[in-house]
């Protein structure tokens, strides 16, 4: 099945598989190596497990139509028959190379495809429509016409099978004998108790196949595996949508709503286990003694299901073994139950306007706005940059954004095709990273004070610095002092952690607790 993956800058559709009881959800293809945005309408090639024909599309305004793509997700290195799929080794072959797959979906004169299905001898049954098959059809008030065709990828020839011009002809299935699929025995109760927790964890978080380097704070080009060895806790974050209330976006960020269920310990062998509410989407942040890091993939589990990965993006073709014996320390200790908590007990970080919660603005007002409020004592007083925006209607708008103002006075900005009002602190810190392609910044443009999802790369976190847990003399950026302590103002480690968490969660303005007219979650017993 195809799954929409939206987490901050990640916004695409990937190919997944799972058991009929919705357990053991795994990525098959699309996380690595694809040159297009989205994989949709995939069908496994009969007799070739791990290979698929699918549609590659740019996602936006294409009616899920695009090029026909062959996906080979079989591992090229594994000798274990149970590990024959490897998302990291998936290969993509465009069977209709003339069909563009870029985000712009330009005119090509070759039409677009939907719902391919292999019928043997290299032939495919497809739906095809002439033209661009995108939003330009709406502008021209001309709907695309999909008919059913037999397609030969080798010759690029289409043979018409059926076309009713009054409707779309899609999802054609050949009527023919097929092998009865095997029965997969359920691993969870057919009628599970939704309050029963799922268990998630890792064998060894240092096991990774990603060849990435980590920078920021104590790291300067350190390989990811070495950086993960310094992780002390796993932060577990629930994601939720704007259905919580009357908001289209969660602020000047592409990140979703976020709530921290807890930070469970990572043991000396790299293992961890935690109980979490079932069904919900989570992403994980392995954090070090300074409380900083991130991971960009949603995971889910059923009630009573145990999901244990090998590491952090470990090789899907290898078996990860415990470092210190037959079982991990986390297995011996048992799952951390403190993370199986109801909605009111989860940590959310509304920026402003949540009367029953600590707001990010409360931290800034308490520690920072006394100097950075645009007044006479502010070293950045009078500094600003100008943002020019051309709206979809062609109107030119101009906004003055303060270089750094951490007060709660409301100012205007432009984001996602609308004029928005937020506290100056939020716009100052978030706008340098939030400006879209329809904006042009002129003048005294500041650094990216907050990089959503990356506290380690956020300038404001670097300037303030952070102390290690249990050692106030151990600084994340060892070559610079704590700020504003160097100016005679003391900030608690707890307040610093709120700012770090706000950045690492994605820099959201809204949470469940500050949406006007939203539900009162204070008495909610839901998981």
Task: Walk through the language-model features, giving the residues of each.
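Short loop/turn segments immediately following beta-strands, especially the blade-tip
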Residues: 19-23, 69-90, 154, 160, ...
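Surface-exposed loop and turn segments in beta-propeller and other repeat-based domains
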Residues: 25-36, 77-107, 164-179
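Signature of short aromatic-glycine-proline-rich micro-motifs recurring in repeat-based ectodomains
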Residues: 36-59, 101-121, 177-179
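Residue position within the beta-strands of beta-propeller blades
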Residues: 1-3, 51-56, 124-128, 181-183
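Aromatic- and Gly/Pro-enriched helix-to-coil junctions and flexible linker segments
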Residues: 212-223, 231-234, 238-240, 279-281, ...
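Structural motif
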Residues: 8-17, 60-72, 80, 133-149
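Beta-rich catalytic cores
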Residues: 11, 36-41, 64, 112, ...
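Short, acidic Ser/Thr/Gly-rich low-complexity loop/linker segments typical of extracellular
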Residues: 252-269
């Amino acid at each position: 099945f195809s799954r929409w993956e939206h987490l901050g800058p990640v916004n695409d559709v990937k190919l997944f598989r799972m058991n009929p009881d919705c357990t053991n959800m795994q990525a098959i293809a699309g996380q690595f190596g694809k040159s297009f945005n989205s994989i949709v309408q995939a069908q496994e090639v009969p007799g070739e497990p791990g290979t698929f024909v699918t549609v590659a599309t740019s996602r936006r305004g294409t009616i899920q139509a695009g090029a026909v793509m062959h996906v080979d997700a079989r591992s090229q290195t594994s000798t274990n028959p149970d590990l024959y799929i490897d998302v990291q080794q998936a290969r993509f072959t465009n069977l209709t190379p003339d069909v563009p797959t870029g985000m712009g979906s330009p005119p090509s004169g070759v039409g677009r495809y939907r719902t391919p299905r292999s019928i043997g001898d290299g032939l495919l049954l497809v739906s095809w429509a002439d033209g661009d098959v995108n939003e330009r059809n709406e502008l021209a008030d001309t709907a695309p016409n999909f008919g059913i065709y037999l397609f030969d990828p080798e010759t690029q020839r289409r043979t018409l099978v059926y076309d009713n011009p009054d409707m779309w002809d899609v999802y054609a299935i050949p009527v023919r004998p097929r092998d009865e699929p095997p029965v997969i025995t359920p691993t969870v109760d057919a009628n599970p108790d939704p309050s029963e927790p799922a268990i998630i964890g890792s064998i060894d978080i240092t096991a990774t196949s990603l060849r990435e380097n980590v920078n920021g704070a104590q790291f300067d080009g350190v390989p990811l595996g070495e950086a993960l060895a310094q992780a002390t806790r796993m932060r577990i974050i629930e994601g939720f949508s704007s259905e919580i209330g009357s908001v289209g976006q969660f602020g000047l960020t592409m990140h979703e709503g976020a709530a921290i269920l807890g930070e469970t310990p990572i043991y000396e062998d790299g293992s961890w286990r935690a109980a979490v509410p079932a069904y919900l989407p989570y992403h994980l942040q392995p954090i070090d003694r300074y409380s900083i890091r991130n991971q960009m993939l949603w995971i889910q589990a059923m009630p009573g299901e145990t999901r244990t990965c090998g590491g952090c993006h470990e090789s899907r073709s290898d078996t990860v073994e415990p470092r210190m014996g037959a079982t991990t320390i986390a297995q011996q200790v048992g799952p951390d139950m403190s993370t199986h908590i109801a909605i009111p007990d989860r940590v959310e970080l509304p920026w402003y306007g949540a009367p029953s919660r600590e707001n990010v603005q409360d931290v800034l007002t308490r520690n920072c706005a006394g100097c950075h409020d645009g007044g006479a004592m502010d070293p950045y007083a009078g500094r600003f940059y100008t943002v020019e925006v051309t709206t979809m209607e062609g109107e030119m708008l101009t906004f003055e954004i303060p270089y750094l103002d951490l007060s709660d006075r409301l100012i205007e900005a432009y984001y996602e095709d609308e004029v928005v009002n937020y506290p100056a602190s939020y716009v100052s810190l978030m706008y340098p990273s939030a400006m879209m392609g329809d904006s042009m910044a002129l003048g005294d443009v500041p650094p990216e004070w907050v990089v959503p999802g990356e506290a380690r790369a956020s300038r404001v976190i670097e300037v303030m610095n952070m102390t290690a847990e249990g050692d106030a003399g151990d600084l994340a950026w060892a070559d610079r002092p704590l700020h504003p302590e160097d100016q005679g103002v003391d900030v608690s480690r707890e307040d610093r952690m709120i700012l770090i968490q706000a950045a690492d969660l994605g820099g959201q303005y809204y949470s469940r607790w500050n949406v006007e007219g939203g539900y009162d979650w204070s008495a909610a017993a839901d998981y």
